[in-house]
């Protein structure tokens, strides 16, 4: 469950290390974002010579969350931390690699490119 001010790990090689959620997209009263939801983020920590710089604002899709996601069969998948993949204005990934596992729920949310880049899909 991601809300404003939540810190997330960047799960790609865009150059960001840590990002902070500044808005949950999808309605003016929407408070929380889960796996597969798009959020507006600000880069809080970046590596030198990366594609993104500290302070820049991007769209991002949440790929892992501590809250997890419940499946239709009753099972639930949770992760140790919150992570997101940075997106450009066309909602395409900025990075060329995705680190760590992602869930199958991204397939429904038109993020097939992230699914194909991920090393493991749960």
Curated annotation (Swiss-Prot):
PANTHER family: 50S/60S RIBOSOMAL PROTEIN L14/L23 (PTHR11761), LARGE RIBOSOMAL SUBUNIT PROTEIN UL14M (PTHR11761:SF3)
GO biological process, one term: translation
InterPro entries tied to this protein: Ribosomal_uL14, Ribosomal_uL14_bac-type, Ribosomal_uL14_CS, Ribosomal_uL14_sf
Organism per entry: Halorhodospira halophila (strain DSM 244 / SL1) (Ectothiorhodospira halophila (strain DSM 244 / SL1))
CDD domains: Ribosomal_uL14 (cd00337)
Alphabetical list of Gene3D superfamilies matching this protein: Ribosomal protein L14 (2.40.150.20)
SMART domains according to UniProt: Ribosomal_L14
Electron transport recorded as keyword: no
Keywords: Ribonucleoprotein, Ribosomal protein, RNA-binding, rRNA-binding
Transmembrane region(s): none
Ranges in coiled-coil conformation: none
Family: Belongs to the universal ribosomal protein uL14 family.
Oligomer status and interactors: Part of the 50S ribosomal subunit. Forms a cluster with proteins L3 and L19. In the 70S ribosome, L14 and L19 interact and together make contacts with the 16S rRNA in bridges B5 and B8.
Protein name listed in UniProt: Large ribosomal subunit protein uL14
GO-annotated cellular components: cytosolic large ribosomal subunit
Gene Ontology molecular function terms on file: large ribosomal subunit rRNA binding; structural constituent of ribosome
Pfam families per record: Ribosomal_L14 (PF00238)
Function: Binds to 23S rRNA. Forms part of two intersubunit bridges in the 70S ribosome.
Protein's UniProt keywords contain RNA-binding: yes
């Amino acid at each position: 469950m991601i809300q404003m001010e939540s810190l997330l790990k960047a799960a790609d090689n865009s150059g960001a290390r840590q990002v902070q959620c500044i808005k949950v997209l999808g309605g003016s009263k929407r408070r929380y974002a889960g796996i597969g939801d798009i959020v507006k983020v600000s880069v809080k920590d970046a590596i030198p010579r990366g594609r993104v710089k500290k302070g820049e604002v991007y769209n991002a899709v949440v790929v892992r969350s501590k809250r997890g996601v419940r499946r239709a069969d009753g099972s639930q998948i949770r992760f140790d931390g919150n992570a997101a993949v940075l997106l450009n204005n066309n909602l395409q990934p900025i990075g060329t690699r995705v680190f760590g596992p992602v869930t199958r729920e991204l397939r429904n949310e038109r993020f097939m490119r992230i699914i194909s880049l991920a090393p493991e899909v749960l």
